[in-house]
């Protein structure tokens, strides 16, 4: 990471997010308190991701606008975080373990208050379960996953880039696939 600025505040930063987007989230969240317009130039091929979209969505919900032009993120000065009450979404990462159990056993699982409009990237794990033959429904109570009756699954290839936290959950299902499950970008 390289940060440049004039005396009195930072104005821009350059950042490679190919290995982790956590530094970008941190810079985005601190930008409104700098007192200057702030631009973050992304130097890597990867420019965005599910966790960055979560960060930007939360900033927006707290009254801070962050613009993304495809290469750089721009935060205008003069913005302040404003919110007195905020309802935190259920943890989709943890919910995926229960969804995987339904897939593995051929049973049914509903995790209350988890819905498809969640901003969390791990929700993409449900797309994997659908490819494996599970039935996924967003009910009033929460997302319901029903596994296949026989507990057998086809082999598939999955790009885990936007939900890499679920790599181990998928690995737990892998021994029960009829052929190989391949993952990529799981780091």
What is each residue range found by the language model?
Residues 1-184:
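Short, structured segments at the rim of ligand-binding sites
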């Amino acid at each position: 990471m390289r940060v440049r600025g004039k005396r009195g505040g930072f104005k821009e930063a350059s950042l490679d997010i190919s290995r982790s987007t956590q530094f970008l989230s941190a810079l985005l969240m601190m930008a409104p308190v700098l007192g200057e317009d702030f631009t973050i130039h992304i130097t890597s091929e990867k420019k965005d991701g599910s966790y960055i979209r979560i960060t930007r969505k939360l900033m927006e919900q707290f009254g801070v606008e962050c613009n993304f032009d495809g290469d750089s993120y721009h935060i205008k000065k003069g913005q302040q975080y404003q919110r007195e009450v905020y309802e935190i979404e259920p943890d989709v990462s943890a919910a995926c373990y229960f969804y995987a159990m339904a897939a593995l056993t051929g049973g049914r699982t509903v995790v209350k208050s988890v819905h498809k409009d969640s901003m969390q990237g791990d929700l993409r794990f449900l797309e994997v379960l659908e490819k494996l033959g599970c039935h996924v429904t967003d009910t009033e109570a929460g997302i319901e996953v029903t596994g296949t009756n026989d507990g057998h699954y086809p082999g598939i290839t999955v790009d885990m880039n936007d939900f890499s936290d679920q790599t181990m959950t998928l690995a737990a299902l892998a021994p029960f696939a009829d052929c190989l499950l391949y993952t990529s970008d799981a780091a």
